Amino acid sequence: MQIVLASQSPSRLMILRQAGVEPVIHPAHVDEDAIIAQLAGAEPDEIVTRLALAKAQAIAPEHPGDVVIGGDSMLLLDGQLQGKPHTPEATIERWRQQRGRTAHLITGHAICLGERRVVEASRTTIHFADASDTDIEAYARSGEPLQCAGAFTLEALGGWFIDAIEGDPSSVIGLSLPVVRRALYSFGLNASDFWTK
């Protein structure tokens, strides 16, 4: 039995590796925009967990005896969910909106083993620094935040611009180890069952 990560996120992979797990990487390809459109008006936690579940369910049939993890993260600011900015221009615009403010990073998790599944959202409060225009532009040009929910990273260059977080740091990076641990326990498994170190 293995852990299968339904993601190509380097951050999610890093979290698992640092926690002693070498997962199988099997990215799920789902139409996130279509799923979000179907969920118009849904609560933010519902949206991110449904995205995570779609990813896990897309590949779970190919891994019937393994633990499959799907995840998705979005930033909630002023009642609006924000995903990845994709461009330096969008990153700069977002940072000008969020600097000096507080927002919530919501990470949806879907952990499946056969027919059993645990679906849970983890919320972490992010206190953004009042970053200068020069730093915002340099950060956007670095390329680092372009594929990150909320246009930031906690574990790399973006760490300069986060004053504080309240909640689970691993969830901000992309995968809550406490959520995964609770799911494993509910399946009668232990985190240490998957350690390779």
Curated annotation (Swiss-Prot):
Needed cofactors: a divalent metal cation
E.C. no: 3.6.1.9
UniProt cross-references to InterPro entries, sorted A to Z: ITPase-like_fam, Maf-like
Recorded catalytic activity of this chain's protein: a ribonucleoside 5'-triphosphate + H2O = a ribonucleoside 5'-phosphate + diphosphate + H(+); a 2'-deoxyribonucleoside 5'-triphosphate + H2O = a 2'-deoxyribonucleoside 5'-phosphate + diphosphate + H(+)
Keyword terms, alphabetized: Cytoplasm, Hydrolase, Nucleotide metabolism
Pfam families from the UniProt entry: Maf (PF02545)
BP terms from Gene Ontology: nucleotide metabolic process
Localization, UniProt: Cytoplasm
GO MF annotations, alphabetized: nucleoside triphosphate diphosphatase activity
Active site: D72
Keyword Cytoplasm in annotation: yes
GO CC annotation, single: cytoplasm
Main subcellular location of this protein, as a coarse class: cytoplasm
Function per UniProt: Nucleoside triphosphate pyrophosphatase. May have a dual role in cell division arrest and in preventing the incorporation of modified nucleotides into cellular nucleic acids.
Family: Belongs to the Maf family.
Protein name as catalogued: Nucleoside triphosphate pyrophosphatase
Organism of provenance: Corynebacterium efficiens (strain DSM 44549 / YS-314 / AJ 12310 / JCM 11189 / NBRC 100395)
